[in-house]
Structure formats: C-alpha cells, structure tokens
C-alpha cells in the first residue's frame, strides 16, 4: 500500500492505525482495508464496503470469511431482509493477534510445549472443533499408542478449559453485544404493557432491569452448556462435539497479576511480592473480568463514577461468593517450594535481641571475679555464644516445617494488608483474605502515570503535578507556595504539563461579559481523561513500531525473499555474500530491538486498560 493510505489511517485514530497494520501483517491488504473502513463507518454490508473501498465483492467475501473465523468481525442479520448481513469490528480477535507471541510464551513456561501447541493451533484457526483436532491421532499408530496419545490430548484440553484458557464458542460470540441487547430490549419492551398508573420512565426502567437479567442468563447459558462433559471408561472429559476458542480475558487477568506483583515488589520487597503472586494466582481464574457486557453497551453506564460503582458491586459479589477469597493454605499451593523464606520477616523479638547484643560492645566482654577466684565473661564468651547460636540455627534449619512456612507467609500477608499506604489485600475474617482489584487497578495506573511524568518531565514537574492533584483546582501562586518554587518556575512547569496533556486550564471569569482583562485561569487534573489520552499515545507508538518494521523489511525485500528460498534456507553462510550476511544480521538486530520496544509499550498499554 502507498504512503497516502497510511497517512489517512494514521490521521483517523491510533486504534485504527494499529488494527489496520495488524490485519495487514496476518491477513493481507484487503483485510486491512476492510478493518479500516468498518472502524471509520461503524457497520456496513458487503455492497456498502465495496462502494467505499472500490474492491471486488468476491475478494471482500473471502477476506470477511477469514476475519470472522479469526474473531475479528461481528455479523448481524437484517430483520427486514434476511439475505443482508451487516459487519462490524470485533477487537477481541485483533487483540489476540497482537498478544499472540506473549500468550504462547506464557503457556510454554507455565504448562509446557504440548499445551502451547494446542493454543497456537486455536489462535491460528480462530476456533476448532475438538473432535476434528483429535482425529489426527487416530491414523497411523497402534491401537494402544493411539488411545493413550488421544487420551493425553483430551486431558490437556480439559486442563486448559478448567484453567480458563479456552472457552466454548457460541453463536452469540459472532454478534456484537449491543445488537443482542437491542433485540432483547425491544422484545422485553414490547411485552411490557403500558399503564395509566405507571409513567413511561418507570416502564423503561423496568424493561431495562428485566433485560439485564435476560442478557446475563443468556450469556451464562452459553458458557456452561448441559452437554459440556462426558464420561468414557471412567474418565471425565470434554464433549468432542464442542467448538473451542481462546479466552483472551484469561490472559488479561494474567497480565494484571504480573502488574500487581511488580507493584508489590517496588513497594515492599521481592519475597513479599512472591507471596502476593501466589495469592493472586490462587484466585486468578475467578477474579473479575477487565470488561463487562454492560460496560460495552453504549448508553447503559456512561459516567466514570457509575462505572467505578458498578465494578465495586461486581467485586463485592465475587467476595461474597468466595471467588476472590483465599487462605494461607491456598497461597502455599502456588508458592515456589525452592524459595527460602526463613528470617524474611523481622519481628519485634528479633529486633530486641539484636539490639541487646550490639547495644554496648564494651560491656559485652566485661569480666567479673567469682567466689572461687576464677574469672567469668559476662558476655558469655565468643565461643560459648557462637556455639549456642550455631546449635540453635542447626536445630531451626533441621525442623523448618510447613507450619513454620505457613506462619511466615501469614506474616507477609499481614504486611501486604497494613505494611504500606497501599492495601494490597483485605483481611475480611481471621485467616481469610480478599484482593481489592478495582482499587489496586487505580493505584497501579496512578503509580505508573506519575512515574512517566517524573521520568519524562523531571522532578519539578512531578512535584507540581502532585500539588495540583492535592489542591484539585489551583492557580500558579498557590502552587508556588505549596511546592516552594518560584512562580516563574511553576509557570514553566505548568506549561510543560499542559503541553504534554497532563493537566488542563479552566477559565474563571470575574465579570458577566467575560472580559479577558478580568479573567484568570486555574489548573486542574482529571484522571479519566488523562489516562485515555495516554492510551491513545501508547497505541500510536505501538503502530509506529510495527510500521517501522514493515518499512525496513520492504526496503530489503529482495534479500529477504532470497533467504526464504528452499535452497538458501539453512545454508545462508554458504549461499550469501559477506555483505548480504552483514545486512541480514543488521535487519535481525533491528527487528529484535523494535519488538522489545513494542512489548514494553504494550505492557504499559495493558496497565492503563485495566
């Protein structure tokens, strides 16, 4: 594609820019044009797409089939004309392609190569029928080997499903949640009769409440069908007729676990963060999703305060259902066995004994004369004390039981609950803890946002920002008095913050005619808008990195095509010139460096989309 096309896509929106490049990389130029057009126009049918893109209907149909199969498009049948289907963008499939490398890397490290192979096949095909996948192990093997290999694969599928990494694909997954909601709402409203004693506002509210219950029941029914499991020869396994797809929400929960663990590591320490990671893993599968169907329906929940209250209510429900509640024994199951945690928490008794020994070194070697005339060292003598401490240490090391380990882990949990200003866990009852995901997600965003401001705009801008957040609405003079800086310095730092879209100006008129001479300006900070602005910047940077990789690959297309030839692949040292080898190594290094930048930027994107 020419540069004019990318300039137009770049100007449309950062998300369109990234998704267009992702679709082009995996599915080709036609798919990229379709994604760009649908993001710009909302939803269209095939004829409308052809008119806007000037593409042939045949090529559009073939690209749409691939996009739907990879969960990159929704479709919806027209109620008035059943032969017409409308298509819109499904971000789930595009995000899965963006995360695909990290997904496979995590599955390989956490489970193994066989599990990663299954996940890779599911991502490549979008979804697959379980029986079709297992049928490949029924061909050229002996009966016993064939049965055992198929049984092992069935166990892997069952494990991945129970852990939440794969889910059942239903017909509703191909429809946008807003289309399902509107259909349910229209049917519910039609069946809700009008009454002279009931206002129209109350009637709409009642219909909306009933529709919410119907929607949640419908989604829950598709998650847990009646024919989910079958029992064969005493083994419980998944029904081979099920169609499975990858569950992106599960990987997003894992990314949240990593981010919260790193936050605990920076605030408290390494060993405590390992304890916290084990606690997060114990409730990871049952933890709240990063998004909810009600939040994806336009107009249902709009106000950021209402969104926060809704997420708090979901978290309260999960806590009441014990889905995000854990104990020390739950942490023990996920805690690394080889990690030595002895003496990792300093108690008051250990502090006191250490201070008593080292408080006065002169008196520790003082000698007194006994009745029999012999001298006695009041410090106990070096040899006697060391021998006693050595014996105690050997005894403690030899009998460090699971109860001792659980006791130390519980001390770390109490440190997470009340050791810092950030409360990482709540002790809801003696020995039972819950994790406040909503509050911690906000803390995580604030921590990284302030770190970015401090690293890019330096310390003085960071101080000014903290002051503005504390004062909520402030002028330059009040900021200067609070942060102990000159007004000129504050003015420069505020300008840099405004330029970086960190804070915004609010005009305060002093007269009715809003005369400029009688107007003064205050500075304020709005958290929600700042995070949204930063997300757009991160997405744009990710797209620019992908575009950069494509550019230098196109510049060296002849060399790369030569390296991909069958006779050259694997024999590059013999078939390529020295200059070509040098260029090839340079391209590989550039690609690795750009991928590292992409992953770092994407990790920040993960944090601010929690």
From Swiss-Prot:
One of its GO terms (molecular function) is DNA-directed RNA polymerase activity. Disulfide bonds: none annotated. Pfam families: HTH_9, POLR3C_WHD, RNA_pol_Rpc82, RPC3_helical. GO terms for cellular component: RNA polymerase III complex. GO terms for biological process: termination of RNA polymerase III transcription; transcription initiation at RNA polymerase III promoter; tRNA transcription by RNA polymerase III. The keyword Zinc applies. Keywords: DNA-directed RNA polymerase, Nucleus, Transcription, Zinc. InterPro entries: POLR3C_WHD, RNA_pol_III_RPC82-rel_HTH, RNA_pol_III_Rpc82_C, RPC3, WH-like_DNA-bd_sf. Residues 538-559 are annotated as: Leucine-zipper. It is found in: Nucleus. Component of the RNA polymerase III (Pol III) complex consisting of 17 subunits. Belongs to the RNA polymerase beta chain family. PANTHER family: DNA-DIRECTED RNA POLYMERASE III SUBUNIT RPC3, RNA POLYMERASE III DNA DIRECTED -RELATED. DNA-dependent RNA polymerase catalyzes the transcription of DNA into RNA using the four ribonucleoside triphosphates as substrates. Specific core component of RNA polymerase III which synthesizes small RNAs, such as 5S rRNA and tRNAs. This is DNA-directed RNA polymerase III subunit RPC3. It comes from Lodderomyces elongisporus (strain ATCC 11503 / CBS 2605 / JCM 1781 / NBRC 1676 / NRRL YB-4239). The gene is RPC82.
């Amino acid at each position: 594609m020419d540069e004019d096309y990318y300039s137009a896509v770049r100007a449309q929106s950062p998300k369109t820019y990234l998704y267009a490049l992702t679709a082009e990389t995996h599915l080709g130029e036609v798919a990229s044009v379709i994604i760009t057009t649908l993001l710009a126009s909302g939803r269209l049918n095939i004829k409308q797409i052809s008119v806007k893109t000037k593409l042939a209907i045949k090529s559009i149909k073939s690209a749409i089939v691939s996009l739907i199969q990879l969960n990159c498009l929704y479709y919806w049948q027209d109620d008035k004309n059943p032969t017409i289907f409308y298509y819109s963008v499904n971000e789930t499939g595009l995000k899965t392609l963006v995360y695909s490398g990290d997904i496979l890397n995590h599955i390989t490290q956490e489970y193994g190569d066989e599990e990663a192979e299954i996940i890779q096949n599911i991502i490549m095909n979008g979804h697959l029928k379980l029986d079709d996948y297992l049928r490949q192990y029924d061909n050229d093997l002996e009966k016993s080997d064939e049965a055992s290999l198929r049984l092992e694969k069935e166990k892997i599928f069952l494990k991945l499903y129970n852990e939440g990494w794969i889910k059942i694909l239903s017909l509703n997954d191909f429809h946008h949640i807003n289309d399902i909601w509107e259909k349910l709402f229209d049917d519910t409203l039609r069946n809700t009769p009008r009454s002279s004693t009931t206002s129209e506002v109350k009637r709409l509210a009642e219909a909306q409440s009933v529709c919410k219950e119907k929607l949640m029941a419908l989604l829950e029914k598709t998650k847990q069908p009646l024919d989910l499991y079958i029992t064969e020869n005493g083994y419980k396994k998944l029904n081979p007729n099920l169609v499975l797809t990858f569950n992106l929400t599960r990987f997003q929960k894992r990314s949240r676990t990593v981010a919260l663990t790193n936050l605990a590591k920076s605030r408290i320490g390494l060993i405590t963060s390992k304890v916290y990671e084990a606690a997060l893993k114990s409730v990871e599968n049952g933890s709240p999703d990063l998004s909810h169907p009600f939040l994806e329906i336009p107009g249902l929940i709009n106000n950021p305060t209402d969104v926060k209250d809704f997420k708090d209510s979901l978290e309260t429900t999960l806590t009441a259902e014990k889905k995000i509640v854990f104990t020390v024994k739950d942490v023990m199951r996920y805690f690394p066995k080889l990690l030595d945690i002895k003496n990792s928490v300093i108690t008051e008794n250990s502090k006191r004994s250490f201070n008593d020994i080292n408080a006065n070194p002169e008196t520790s070697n003082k000698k007194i004369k006994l009745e029999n005339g012999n001298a006695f060292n009041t410090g106990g003598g070096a040899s006697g004390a060391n021998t006693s401490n050595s014996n105690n240490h050997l005894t403690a090391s030899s009998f460090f039981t699971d109860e001792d380990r659980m006791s130390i882990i519980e001390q770390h949990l109490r440190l997470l609950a009340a050791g810092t200003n950030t409360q990482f866990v709540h002790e809801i009852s003696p020995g039972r803890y819950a994790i406040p995901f909503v509050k911690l997600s906000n803390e995580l965003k604030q921590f990284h946002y302030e770190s970015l401001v401090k690293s890019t705009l330096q310390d003085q801008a960071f101080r000014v920002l903290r002051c503005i957040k504390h004062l909520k609405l402030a002028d330059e003079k009040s900021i200067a008095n609070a942060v102990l800086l000159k007004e000129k310095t504050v003015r420069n730092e505020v300008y840099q913050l405004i330029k970086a879209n960190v804070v915004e100006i609010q005009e305060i008129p002093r007269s009715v005619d809003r005369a400029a001479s009688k107007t003064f300006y205050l500075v304020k900070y709005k958290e929600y808008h700042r995070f949204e602005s930063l997300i757009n910047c991160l997405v744009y940077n990710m797209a620019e990195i992908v575009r950069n990789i494509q550019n230098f690959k196109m510049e060296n297309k002849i060399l790369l095509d030569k390296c991909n030839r069958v006779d050259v692949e694997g024999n590059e040292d013999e078939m390529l010139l020295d200059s070509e080898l040098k260029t090839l190594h340079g391209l590989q290094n550039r690609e690795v460096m750009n991928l590292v930048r992409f992953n770092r930027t994407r990790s920040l994107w993960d944090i601010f989309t929690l």
